[in-house]
Amino acid sequence: VLQTVNGTTYAYVLYDGYGASGALVAKVRCAENGGSSIVWTTDPYGTEGTSLNAKSGFQLSTPYLDDKGTPDDASDDTLYVGTISQYDDYEGGEWLTGTGSKVMALTGLDQNKPTVTNVLTGINGQINTPITTDGTYLYFGTWPGGSNAGTYYQVKLSDYSVKTFTPDSYGFYWAGAVSDGTNVYFGSDNGLLYWRSIADFDTTGGVLDLTDVASDAGNVRSTVMMDEDGFLYFTTQGGYLWCCSYKDGLTVEWHIKLGATSTSTPTKVGDRIYVGYYSGFNAGGVQCVTVSIGEDGSSYIPSVAPVASGFPVQSSIVVMGDGTGTDYLYFNTNAQKGAGYCYSYDGGTTGSKVW
């Protein structure tokens, strides 16, 4: 999570806690040419009030930073962090348990060390989704493994009151939520896209079964992205990019096959949607899907182009540009020798490597 305060950019990073220290959050001052430095880290496991006290070395949830609407004043900011806090040792590693996950609030982010307080503890399953917000509530989901049912949570920021939704089966993995102001949308394993009422999260909602459109849709393991026209975009492990809308109900506008499976949250600038894909740990790349809106308000696909290839990309794509000229794309790879890349793309037949 990035934050810029009075011209200085900071990154808050949750990282795996293998060993005695447990999971940690670090605040990093970002600078060019190798000049970045760590401002603080939370304390190792066992220090109440300044430690996450999360023993698992497996952490996948992206934190959420609430800057209270004052981006140049970090004194009242809160960083919400979800962790898997328990595991059982076995010879040669660790085996994750389905209990012990929790959400914490880190305050005093401008101090030498933050204060850590519990928001919600005793959560069943792994918190493997990012924590997202609609400005009033936090949203996140859990994954208990296999076809076991996970739970999606709605936590009110003002008092930490909780409402939950638990489907009949399957959980939520990397599947962050997005809101249109009335409903919230999130995907799950087994090719399902859910909507829930913000006002009545625990009682009112529905589901769209993507396998009715593509039997090989696969798990939804990306966050749902919504554009200014209200269309919802996400990817599935069956190797598809999807566009859905909520008009008279949740429906599929279109879906398109990608180069391979995908867990990448789409990034849309102008009419271009950038998305990563991968096949194992040594193949994949980035593609650009160009979309248009018809006179009837529907969305359709005029073209798909390769931007980069030769490496597995599971991350989202950070884009500098507006989708009309040359865009610069930044991403990393999930490989034995992973790396960060920058590519440029101007709407042509392919992209160009910058570094």
Segment roles from a protein language model:
Residues 1-355:
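Extracytoplasmic/lumenal domain signature
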